[in-house]
Amino acid sequence: MFSPKIIILSTGSELTSGRSQDTNSSWIANELFGIGFTVSKLVVLPDDPEAILEELRTLVSLATKKNPVLLIMTGGLGPTEDDYTLEVVCKLKGVSSVESVVARQRIEAFYKLRGKNFQESLQTAIRQISVPKDSTILNNEVGIAPGFIVSLGENAHLGCMPGVPGEMTEMFREEFSTWILKKYSTRELHSGFRFIWWMSESQFQKEFISKEESVTSEKVIWGVAAKRGYIRVSFQSNERALVDFLLKKLDEIYGPKSTLDVFEELPKLLIEKKITVGTAESCTGGLISKIFTDKPGSSTYFYGGVISYDNGVKEGILGVKKNTLKEFGAVSMETAKEMAEGALVALGVDYSISVTGIAGPGGGTPQKKVGLVYFGIGQKNEKTETHEHYFPFPRSSFREFAAHTGIYLLYNRLKRLA
């Protein structure tokens, strides 16, 4: 089987009008890269059935035996009148739709749980539990509407998933990626990655890629993606030893700044060590707490957070001294330290993260510029760590840089103590 030409299509007039951003395509492309596939093209289409149908026909016409095509489409599987995916695919295939038994059971349970009559809402619900005849069903373990995969001739396939990110990501990881590997993978491909903290793509290119000959050999596929506060470096090769060599190189050169996925690894550490954590946030406005609580099961280790935007909250709830605020200011190493220590007491946790900074665009001074931020990492009965960073970026980016850095700093402390 030849490797397919993969094209990702995102549908939704909210995307083509600019009201929403297409995050699904980049996520899928990154997941595909991790299992050995690259994307040829990204397409965004409005909720226009004729436009969608025309685009699909054009893309399917590109498929040949030596160049098969895999189309991955998200969106348009909901209950509303502008959800056209099922209708378009059935028309493209020349087939009728049929109910998914599993999806029907899920939606009946959904209605029963909420005390609603399924039969009264059947016409609306039926759109969400139907798939094209003779399709491979992708079960939806998070929402209602199933996804599906259809054959469009001998050399083309189309996979459709919901546009809701939480539903799509679960469906892709649990079912669609497995189907792709079984269908198209012809060789074992090894991969690995690292996060490199506070590093730009260009800096990494200069420091590592240009100097490491094995990276630029034909045996390695590498990629770098810039995130808020870090870059994600990935390698793929048929040779496991080569991937391991490059990852070890990164760890040797960048030390503790080279990590696994901190946002996945930190919760594991907290659960494994039975550690509780809380936050004291000023400039990030609760974003660190959001990162924690985005993870299912976070209540086992995350107790809560204090958004101490006002100095009165810093004093009244966190116990920051009035003299500290007067002498050093709200944005200072000293205040970050007392915020972290106050959070330990106020929340009754083992560890705490505090952050205070100047998000801008105003509020800066020659001594304390916009982008300056201080962190405290508190530990019960131990000395509090403090850190200073400078992120001279727009307000929303600054907040993400700061929140991600706070998560990293706690992770780093726990790893050092392990």
Curated annotation (Swiss-Prot):
Top-rank taxon, per record? Bacteria
Offer one Pfam family short name for this entry. MoCF_biosynth
Q: Which InterPro entries match?
A: CinA, CinA-like_C, CinA_C, Competence-induced_CinA, MoaB/Mog-like_dom_sf, MoaB/Mog_dom
Q: Which family does it belong to?
A: Belongs to the CinA family.
The protein's name: CinA-like protein
Traced from the root, the source organism's taxonomic lineage reads: Bacteria, Pseudomonadati, Spirochaetota, Spirochaetia, Leptospirales
